[in-house]
Amino acid sequence: MTQSNLLPKTFRTKSGKEISIALGTGTKWKQAQTINDVSTELVDNILLGLKLGFRHIDTAEAYNTQKEVGEALKRTDVPREDIWVTTKYSPGWGSIKAYSKSPSDSIDKALAQLGVDYVDLFLIHSPFFTTEQTHGYTLEQAWEALVEAKKAGKVREIGISNAAIPHLEKLFAASPSPEYYPVVNQIEFHPFLQNQSKNIVRFCQEHGILVEAFSPLAPLARVETNALAETLKRLAEKYKKTEAQVLLRYTLQRGILPVTTSSKESRLKESLNLFDFELTDEEVNEINKIGDANPYRAFFHEQFKDL
């Protein structure tokens, strides 16, 4: 089902706070940089995004782009209170251990690199880690550290990325009260992967957890043979939009908040210009059906094999 028509430009977390489409600052921005360099290209891109109307910036410890976000926050004319900043604790991956000695250290490092007194949303980047990778922290203990940071005012909201239902249930159990349940689960979502793990979107939406989508444009950017090509072309022509705008609008109408990025000003503008048209229920269902028949997963292949 789609959400109601005339979608607002912002969603709300279950605590009532407004959150809008995110400008991502993922690792592609630092591939040509050494770890201590600051990418002026990324700083300029964030400043451009803010100028065009983005009010949500998504970064992460693992991206190594918090310094760039901090520099942009320092230079922009947009008041800090009008910008939603999301970042993430990296608990380690494969042979790579967590960058910080603890989740609390990760939060303090984020505040310092971002140059802010608080972060609007702090996520655990992945639930797939061992205590050896995290210097001794289980998922529940990492969550307890986020709870304490929220109590201390260092973070306003807390959540997770790439969580399946069993992970979320662990976080519920580790929370002192529903006030400290995760408010966001950021997952890979696009027509070819409508549930990163079994029934995750419905579960989140039934429990007041906002689903954010990374890689919402995967059918255009990552898939070699796009089974949606004809459908997207037809809908783009019908609504006088780009195929990317059709996909982002589809994501919104599924009740999911996209995280997107581009180095091109025209595409950044397009990503914000999604609210003057609406796909019909039949069109959304057509995209759903074709997507389900052509599954594609870009990330976490092994981790979700049994989830």
Swiss-Prot record:
GO BP terms, alphabetized: ketone metabolic process
Protein name (Swiss-Prot/TrEMBL): NADPH-dependent conjugated polyketone reductase C2
Temperature-related behavior of activity: Optimum temperature is 40 degrees Celsius.
SUPFAM superfamilies assigned to the protein according to its UniProt record, in alphabetical order: NAD(P)-linked oxidoreductase
Recorded family membership: Belongs to the aldo/keto reductase family.
Site residues (Lowers pKa of active site Tyr), renumbered to this chain: K88
Effect on the protein of changing T27A: Decreased catalytic activity to 5.7% of wild-type
Disulfide bonds: none
Entry's pH dependence statement: Optimum pH is 7.
GO molecular function: 2-dehydropantolactone reductase (A-specific) activity; aldo-keto reductase (NADPH) activity; oxidoreductase activity, acting on NAD(P)H as acceptor
Active site (record annotation): Y63, H125
Residues annotated for NADPH binding in this entry: 26-28, 58, 161, 186, 215, 217, 222, 260-264, 267
Post-translational modification: The N-terminus is blocked.
Catalytic reactions on record: (R)-pantolactone + NADP(+) = 2-dehydropantolactone + NADPH + H(+); isatin + NADPH + H(+) = 3-hydroxyindolin-2-one + NADP(+)
Pfam families: Aldo_ket_red
Domain of life: Eukaryota
Subunit comment: Monomer.
Species of provenance: Candida parapsilosis (Yeast)
UniProt-listed PANTHER family: 2,5-DIKETO-D-GLUCONIC ACID REDUCTASE, NADP-DEPENDENT OXIDOREDUCTASE DOMAIN-CONTAINING PROTEIN
EC number: 1.1.1.-, 1.1.1.358
Enzyme class: oxidoreductase
Its job: NADPH-dependent conjugated polyketone reductase with broad substrate specificity and strict stereospecificity. Reduces ketopantoyl lactone (2-dehydropantolactone), isatin and camphorquinone. Does not act on menadione, p-nitrobenzaldehyde and pyridine-3-aldehyde.
Alphabetical UniProt keywords: NADP, Oxidoreductase
Means of activity regulation: Inhibited by quercetin.
